């Protein structure tokens, strides 16, 4: 069984590249941080797969964020991933959401934002409306309009052996001019036959052979995908001391402690009065040095 891994592959004779991502634990970590409705869990899985597939196209160190915003019950759904395939995500919603709610049922009138942030270089952001029935439709439209590259995605979420899985495939034309529309259509037809169980369970080499055994496919080394939110007690403490001490004292007087909650993983960090005093005391010499 293939778990939490991204595979890149190339159709050497057809000028088309492909990607395959298969996730279970990384997906489960994201949807277990809050009591997300079933339809929103599915949407987060689709966003997660899409982001992972897109980060695989990065030719530099950096990150990609895919964000949905709308005026529906779900106001925000966002996944962030980087070149090392460290991913995290969160969503915000209000009210009840039906188990079979569609993208448009959840988001209402909204848009998709794709943000690319290189460690070195300029930040890029693309915004598109929610055209199409599914998230895959929206992202395919983004590539057609902004990148002008023929791209297809197949994204699946579901359960296997009682555990949540999210997986997907992407094929994209390589802009070298040697491929034909017929080549791409041929691969589209083959990829569209993939079954959920195959995506959730088969190792990449076996899955690609089942789909493309008549074509020449080069499979590259796999890359692990892992949930990573980046929160810590140290970072929480550093955030607290950016607030005026008087304001923190008011919270202490009312609550008895100061707590920070990580939306990504669901962890809370609590600091009592003695710990707060120590934080500010340690920070004081640093502030004097800065002045």
UniProtKB/Swiss-Prot annotation:
GO terms for cellular component: cytoplasm. SUPFAM superfamilies: Hsp33 domain, HSP33 redox switch-like. Disulfide bonds join 229-231, 262-265. GO terms for molecular function: protein folding chaperone; unfolded protein binding. It comes from the Bacteria. Keywords: Chaperone, Cytoplasm, Disulfide bond, Redox-active center, Zinc. The keyword Cytoplasm applies. It holds the Pfam family HSP33. It is found in: Cytoplasm. The keyword Disulfide bond applies. GO terms for biological process: protein refolding. Under oxidizing conditions two disulfide bonds are formed involving the reactive cysteines. Under reducing conditions zinc is bound to the reactive cysteines and the protein is inactive. Redox regulated molecular chaperone. Protects both thermally unfolding and oxidatively damaged proteins from irreversible aggregation. Plays an important role in the bacterial defense system toward oxidative stress. This is 33 kDa chaperonin. It comes from Vibrio campbellii (strain ATCC BAA-1116). The lineage of its organism: Bacteria, Pseudomonadati, Pseudomonadota, Gammaproteobacteria, Vibrionales.
């Amino acid at each position: 069984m293939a778990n939490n891994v991204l595979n890149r592959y190339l159709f050497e004779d057809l000028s088309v590249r492909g990607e395959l991502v298969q996730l279970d634990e990384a997906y489960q970590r994201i949807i277990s941080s809050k009591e997300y409705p079933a339809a929103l869990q599915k949407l987060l899985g689709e966003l997660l797969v899409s982001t992972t597939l897109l980060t695989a196209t990065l030719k530099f160190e950096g990150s990609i964020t895919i964000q949905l915003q709308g005026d529906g019950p779900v106001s925000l759904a966002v996944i962030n991933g980087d070149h090392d395939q460290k991913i995290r995500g969160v969503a915000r919603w209000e009210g009840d959401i039906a188990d079979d709610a569609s993208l448009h049922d959840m988001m209402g009138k909204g848009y998709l934002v794709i943000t690319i942030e290189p460690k070195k270089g300029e930040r890029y952001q693309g915004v598109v409306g929610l055209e199409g029935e599914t998230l895959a439709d929206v992202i395919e439209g983004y590539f057609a309009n902004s990148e002008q590259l023929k791209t297809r995605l197949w994204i699946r979420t579901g359960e296997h052996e009682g555990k949540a899985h999210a997986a997907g495939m992407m094929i994209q034309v390589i802009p070298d001019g040697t491929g034909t529309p017929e080549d791409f259509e041929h691969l589209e037809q083959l990829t569209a036959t993939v079954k959920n169980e195959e995506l959730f369970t088969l190792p990449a080499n076996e899955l690609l052979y089942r789909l493309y055994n008549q074509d020449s496919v080069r499979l590259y080394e796999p890359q692990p995908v892992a949930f990573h939110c980046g929160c810590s007690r140290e970072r929480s403490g550093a955030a607290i001391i950016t607030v005026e001490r008087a304001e923190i004292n008011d919270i202490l007087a009312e609550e008895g402690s100061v707590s920070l909650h990580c939306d990504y993983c669901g962890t809370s960090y609590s600091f009592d009065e003695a710990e707060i005093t120590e934080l500010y005391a340690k920070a004081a010499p640093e502030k004097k040095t800065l002045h």
